[in-house]
């Protein structure tokens, strides 16, 4: 099971937020791929 991405801090920059969204998307893809 891949580690879940850390939640961005409340004062995270837009760049950090977009990086976080990408990490979450990759994380979800990894999980769904492992299931099938």
UniProtKB/Swiss-Prot annotation:
Phylogenetic placement of the source organism: Eukaryota, Metazoa, Chordata, Craniata, Vertebrata
Transmembrane segments: none
Cell compartments where the protein resides: Secreted
GO molecular function, one term: neuropeptide hormone activity
GO biological process: feeding behavior; neuropeptide signaling pathway
Keyword line: Amidation, Hormone, Secreted
Modified residues (Tyrosine amide): 36
CDD domains in alphabetical order: PAH
Pfam families in the record: Hormone_3
Protein name: Pancreatic polypeptide MY
């Amino acid at each position: 099971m891949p580690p879940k991405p850390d939640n961005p801090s409340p004062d995270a920059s837009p760049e950090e937020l977009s990086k976080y969204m990408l990490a979450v998307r990759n994380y979800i893809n990894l999980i769904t791929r492992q299931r099938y």
